Amino acid sequence: MKSRFLKAAFALVSACTLMACTPEKENNAAQDAAKTAAPATEAAQQTKDENMNKLTLTAEWDKVFPKSDKVEHSKVTFKNHFGIELAADMFVPKDTSLKVNGKFPAIAVSGPFGAVKEQSSGLYAQQMAERGFLTIAFDPSFTGESGGEPRYMNSPDINTEDFMASVDFLSTRDNVDPERIGIIGICGWGGMAINAAGIDTRVKATVASTMYDMSRVTANGYFDSANNADARNEARKALMAQRTKDFKNGTYDLAGGVVDPLPDDAPYFVKDYYAYYKTPRGYHKRSLNSNKGWAASAGTSLMNTKLLAYADEIRNPVLIIHGEKAHSRYFGEGAFEKMTGKKANVPAKLDATKNWSKTVGNKELLVIPGASHVDLYDNLEKIPFEKLNEFFKTNLK
């Protein structure tokens, strides 16, 4: 079971995550699995797509959720400080009740890790636009319709900058109040959002929903099972071997997306991922997790970069949302504890009739009874949009 669990994690997150939490024998098996999932010829196709140099934006509505008649939708682009052009969906509310002096409060959204804006982040953005906020959902650098070469890479620095670039874009729009801008990060982009909030004082309120701390899981393995120097050293060796191989071949092997076909005895969270990314519910042709995944050497720098290093210095409000049954909940609890210096102390069993929360100053941890990690991707009965609405209306005024 341990081997299957870790291999599933490998497919869903990245090669470096699995290598950080498995012994050498399982590392070799993981590398073999990656080679099988992404032969060099396929890797060449996957890492040299049309958005490397010039953005190609789809004109049709190709989201995995229905289009709302309460908002105006358009595509926009903007560059980050690394010169990478980002693509985003912008949702402008027809409801102008939150406008002050002709300007909207605004929210930038991204995630989950390995998803595209046509999936969960777009749903969040549209839902918040229905509530009166001008929103954008953007594809991070190297993914989706955004630029960046090579494809299917990630970086704690560049992806944090992506959030800050979204604030650049929003704060200079004529119809946005630059003093009322917030951000939402989903899954692995929850940690990126908190990191961005720790740097960018223009971000007045931050939500991390069903968050991962990608630096923690990459360096320590799942549930900190490989939190020791020897394990990290072995993981670094494997990553460097992958880099050498990629450079020699002139291509980038892919780690593999969600495991397919799905084993009957797969862990529940892998089944949840499959139910979202591999079925009509959430599948998208540009989504890494729906297809062949990240480059196998992606996220190398996450091994030595702690996203939450200065989270305790964030002065503006932060709301962390997790499901009671989410395998990832410990990331949110850890982030809350880092920011507040107080233990989360989530009860072992929650009252099924109401959400559980703990607030310290302007930082809040909210846990949804019965909800899993993936429930907070698209389950409108589980995602507490009215809580998000209240949070942003209170803090973006």
Feature locations, PLM:
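Short beta-strand element of the alpha/beta-hydrolase
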Residues: 100-112
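Alpha/beta-hydrolase-fold enzymes
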Residues: 194-279
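Catalytic histidine-centered segment of alpha/beta-hydrolase-like enzymes
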Residues: 368-382
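The serine-hydrolase catalytic nucleophile loop
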Residues: 103, 114-126, 140, 332
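Short beta-strand/loop motif that positions the catalytic acidic residue
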Residues: 314, 320-322
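Alpha/beta-hydrolase active-site loop
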Residues: 153-174
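N-terminal cap/lid segment of alpha/beta-hydrolase-fold proteins
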Residues: 51-102, 377
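Conserved alpha/beta-hydrolase
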Residues: 127-147
